[in-house]
Amino acid sequence: MTKYMYDYFTKCLKDIKKDIPKNWENVSYANDTCPSFLFNGFLIFIDHKIENKRELQGYKRFHIINNDDYGNGVKPLLETDEFTKVIKFVNN
């Protein structure tokens, strides 16, 4: 991962880093637009808190897909700007 991507990914997580459960596996990939975590068969993408700093503007901050669907262009199972909704979704 390039230093730029590492710095950007760090900024994406800055405000919620302490809230990310320890059992989530960081599977971030430099070619993705934002960092991602794997938990319970779900891939959780976490974009920048500030929308105009996101590579893809006009989208919600958090996206969840089934891990098996990665790279297939499927519609997310959940799109939200609220981290509490992400936690609830992946734990059900």
Residue ranges and their predicted role:
Residues 19-22, 71, 91-92:
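Structural alpha-beta junctions
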Residues 42-85:
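Intrinsically disordered, low-complexity regulatory segments enriched in Ser/Thr/Pro
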Residues 1-42:
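Negatively charged, low-complexity tracts enriched in Asp/Glu with abundant Ser/Thr
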